[in-house]
Regions:
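Aromatic- and glycine-enriched glycan-recognition loops and surfaces
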Residues: 1, 63, 174-175
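Active-site beta-loop-alpha junctions enriched in small/polar residues
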Residues: 1, 21-24, 50-52, 87-89, ...
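N-terminal pre-domain/capping segments
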Residues: 1-44, 138-140, 211-218
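Catalytic-core regions built around general acid/base machinery
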Residues: 4-11, 67-75, 132, 177, ...
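Conserved dinucleotide-binding and phosphotransfer motif residues
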Residues: 12, 78, 185
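Active-site acidic/histidine proton-transfer and metal-coordination neighborhood
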Residues: 15, 23-114, 204
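Short beta-strand and adjacent tight-turn residues that come in two discontinuous sequence segments
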Residues: 19, 47, 192
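Histidine-acidic metal/acid-base catalytic patches
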Residues: 41, 101-117, 121-218
């Protein structure tokens, strides 16, 4: 919109870790995207997945990996690095042996493409987030973190509870092991997310609880 984000970031005393964009914008004008990232003082541009895209189609995944390599090379020429941010769609099988994320890991070039790993979404998708983080190794440049569990008080109508995002340390994810892995590979930043299901309907309260956990465990 019309907000002056440069001024707002400076006024709040914040640093910009990464700039998010879509692959189409990057393919149209990599220099413009790189210039915007550099204007905020960050070296990372992140693609947050594809919309209206079939992650279960093997040919489409091979094509996506090639497009990411090309876009990453264009950014690298401008002094900026490309990261791919997962959700749960990348866990779809493209054949009997491989998932979409396998294709991305195996066919993207570490010179041009690395990863911002979201452990919540792979856990939500039923995957072993720690195993994937170990497989990524130093290609995981940023780590996206929140917890997963259920917030309910009193009796439940059924024995099956809906799970959702939670404050760090209040859910059921093995955050200690995930944290140890992230720190062992030297991630550049840990990005705390709180996107809904807040304590007392307050995102500030939820973020404070999670921030206290981070301060204690990092």
């Amino acid at each position: 919109g019309n907000l002056d984000w440069h001024a707002l970031v400076k006024e709040a005393g914040l640093q910009v870790v990464s700039l998010h964009t879509d692959l189409g914008s990057l393919e149209r004008d990599a220099k413009a995207v790189a210039d915007e990232a550099k204007s905020f003082g960050t070296k990372y541009v992140v693609i947050t997945g594809m919309y209206r895209f079939d992650y279960g189609d093997e040919a489409s995944m091979h094509d996506l990996a090639a497009r990411l390599n090309k876009a990453g090379a264009a950014l690298k020429a401008e002094g900026v690095e490309l990261l791919y941010h997962n959700h749960n769609c990348e866990l779809r099988h493209v054949n009997a042996e491989k998932r979409a994320y396998d294709i991305l890991l195996e066919e993207t070039d570490p010179q041009f493409v690395n990863f911002e790993f979201d452990s919540y979404w792979f856990t939500e998708g039923g995957a072993n987030a720690l195993a994937w983080m170990q497989r990524l190794g130093t290609r995981m440049k940023l780590w996206h973190i929140n917890d997963r569990g259920t917030r309910i008080s009193g009796s439940a109508v059924t024995p099956i509870l809906k799970t959702d995002s939670m404050e760090l340390g209040t859910g059921n994810m093995d955050l200690d092991s995930l944290m140890a892995q992230a720190l062992s590979v030297g991630v550049d930043a840990v990005i705390l997310e709180s996107h809904r299901n807040w304590v007392d309907n307050s995102p500030i309260k939820s973020l404070q609880i999670s921030a206290e956990y981070l301060e204690k465990h990092m």
